[in-house]
């Protein structure tokens, strides 16, 4: 059977369900597909289809993730749901499933629980820009005041993590009833998706951002000069444009005199393209893997940052023993390893942590031996002797 062509007639947005275990994330995901399937906008999936999520590997870490897709009248969505709490933590930190927004599922019977808070904090740290609340299991709560209290509590919780708690939509749903075909609750799923359409903004396309390409390899071509190759992460580049070479050594400016892809000359390269850029007046020894080529003035190199980190368990190929402040691993950033030191660890409540165990999620302060192009929201791996022992995301640039 011929594969269906992906029709790009609607804007595409990536979302996911987050929240405490057993509050109904997977049931809600199934309910959304079933309600939209009745309008021909999704393929109906049941709980078991989504719950038996396949394992994936991202940056050397195994994560179970279910992907479903569906449409509303105005958009095409890719929706990610994870079976286990640890999968969420790993997913959000590695950026395996980049989310432009998330539906946070809270059971009206329980209110916000430990993982609700942890997922909201993580959403803040890893840069999930917008949230919508699905207050689930509302069919099981007879008292309207009780539901109102839970809603107030969640709004306060969101505000305490610097989300706009007063403005975020909170929709009362019963995922199970909607899945069973109860028309009143099916209507609530429509209402939820309308909120997602309206309050999760369309992401800025990578192509519209300032140009950035991480250098993977460098060649010199006799008579023509030096070529840097890599995948364009964002923006676009034309022949004749000036770029800066940033990281490891002092920043310098050069002009792109040629853009090649698959040995053919291009007028311009854009986000997602694997290209070779011919650079004017640059020697092969001036540029190396791990540097980035960027639009002039768009990025500065840094050495000190805070990161939200997941430390791999022994079974995941991580360390067998704990480590302490002062630990000196390699930080794998974009295309290269940079030696650095972890100077401090902090718990969620801001207190200092002495020791970090395999399997922990922790906030750390890292300092690199040479400046590289790091940015808030950027992913990195922590490695030791070539194997990955942790994954992180930059939550703040210090210096």
From Swiss-Prot:
This is Elongation factor Tu. It comes from Prochlorococcus marinus (strain MIT 9211). GTP hydrolase that promotes the GTP-dependent binding of aminoacyl-tRNA to the A-site of ribosomes during protein biosynthesis. The lineage of its organism: Bacteria, Bacillati, Cyanobacteriota, Cyanophyceae, Synechococcales. The keyword GTP-binding applies. GO terms for molecular function: GTP binding; GTPase activity; translation elongation factor activity. It comes from the Bacteria. CDD domains: EF_Tu (cd01884), EFTU_II (cd03697), EFTU_III (cd03707). Residues 136-139 are annotated as: G4. It is found in: Cytoplasm. Belongs to the TRAFAC class translation factor GTPase superfamily. Classic translation factor GTPase family. EF-Tu/EF-1A subfamily. Its EC number is 3.6.5.3. Residues 60-64 are annotated as: G2. Residues 19-26 are annotated as: G1. It catalyses: GTP + H2O = GDP + phosphate + H(+). Monomer. Signal peptide: none annotated. Residues 10-204 form the tr-type G domain. One of its GO terms (cellular component) is cytosol. GTP binds at residues 19-26, 81-85, 136-139. Residues 81-84 are annotated as: G3. Its main location: cytoplasm. Mg(2+) binds at residue 26.
């Amino acid at each position: 059977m011929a594969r269906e062509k992906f029709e790009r007639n609607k804007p595409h947005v990536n979302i996911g369900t987050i929240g405490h275990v057993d509050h109904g994330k997977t049931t809600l995901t199934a309910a959304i597909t079933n309600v939209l399937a009745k309008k021909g906008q999704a393929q109906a999936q049941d709980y078991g289809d989504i719950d038996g999520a396949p394992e994936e590997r991202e940056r050397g870490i195994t994560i179970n993730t279910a992907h479903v897709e569906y449409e509303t009248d105005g958009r095409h969505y890719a929706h990610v749901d994870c079976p286990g709490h640890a999968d969420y933590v790993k997913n959000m930190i590695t950026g395996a499933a980049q989310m432009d927004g998330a539906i946070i599922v809270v059971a009206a019977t329980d209110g916000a629980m430990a993982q609700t808070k942890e997922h909201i904090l993580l959403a803040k740290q890893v840069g999930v820009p917008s949230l919508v609340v699905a207050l689930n299991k509302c069919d099981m709560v007879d008292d309207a005041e009780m539901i109102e209290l839970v809603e107030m509590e969640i709004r306060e919780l969101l505000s305490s993590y610097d989300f706009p708690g007063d403005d975020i939509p909170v929709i009362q749903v019963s995922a199970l009833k909607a899945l069973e075909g109860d028309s009143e609750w099916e209507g609530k799923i429509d209402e939820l998706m309308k909120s997602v359409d309206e309050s999760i903004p369309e992401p800025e396309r990578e192509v519209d951002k300032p140009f950035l390409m991480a250098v993977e390899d460098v060649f010199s071509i006799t008579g023509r000069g030096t070529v840097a190759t890599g995948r364009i992460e964002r923006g676009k580049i034309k022949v004749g444009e000036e770029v800066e070479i940033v990281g490891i050594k002092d920043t310098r400016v050069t002009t792109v005199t040629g853009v090649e892809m698959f040995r053919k000359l291009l007028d311009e390269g854009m986000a997602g393209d694997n290209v070779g850029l011919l650079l004017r007046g640059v020697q092969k020894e001036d540029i190396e893997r791990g540097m980035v080529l960027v639009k002039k003035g768009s990025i500065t190199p840094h050495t000190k940052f805070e990161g939200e980190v997941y430390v791999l368990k022994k079974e995941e190929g991580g360390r067998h023993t704990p480590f302490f402040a002062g630990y000196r691993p390699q930080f794998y950033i974009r295309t290269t390893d940079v030696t650095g030191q972890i100077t401090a660890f902090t718990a969620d409540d801001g207190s200092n942590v002495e020791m970090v165990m395999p399997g922990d999620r922790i906030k750390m302060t890292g300092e690199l031996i040479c400046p590289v192009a790091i940015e808030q929201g950027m992913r990195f791996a922590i490695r030791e002797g070539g194997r990955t022992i942790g994954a992180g995301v930059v939550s703040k640039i210090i210096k």
